[in-house]
Amino acid sequence: KPVSVIDDGTVSEETRLGAIGDIQFAIDKKGIDSDMVVIAGDNLFTFSLKKYYEFFKAIQTDCVCVKPFGDMEMLKQFGVAEIDENGVLIDVEEKPQEPKSNLAVYATYMYRRETIPLFKTYIAEGNKPDAPGYFVEWLCKRKQMHAFMFEEECYDIGTPQSLEHVSKIFEAKRM
């Protein structure tokens, strides 16, 4: 399907909708009533979206991408997932002070059609509209979700410093 850019009209920090508010804005603006993929624009990854999508279709639940992460201090900057032996999410906590596992959740989500109305519910209940991980934290307490485990690379390039760091990593690989 073609990709389209949707402008929410925000011109300042004070009027921004937040990531979850922007997702709801896109749902309303485009009349989305189907399964949906949400990928943060500041993610750079090398895993296969096709494999992830095939997993999503086979498992028939909402899914998140997770990867084991070695640096427990850095893990505090991510969503952290706890899963059972079948890959079912038991809990997700966004940016925990004390991570309960070493599984980082990356902002690449696949949602089933029946989940789409829950974005509006989440916002109406007054929940945090910022990071999309807060929605996952809320959602996994209401319905079954699965974790897609990957081992390839995934980086957050949302700051000039992290973009420069990742650029150096990829430049070194080309040599």
Q: What do these predicted ranges mean?
A:
Residues L44, Y53-K57, V88-D156, P160-M175:
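Catalytic-core segments of class I nucleotidyltransferases/pyrophosphorylases
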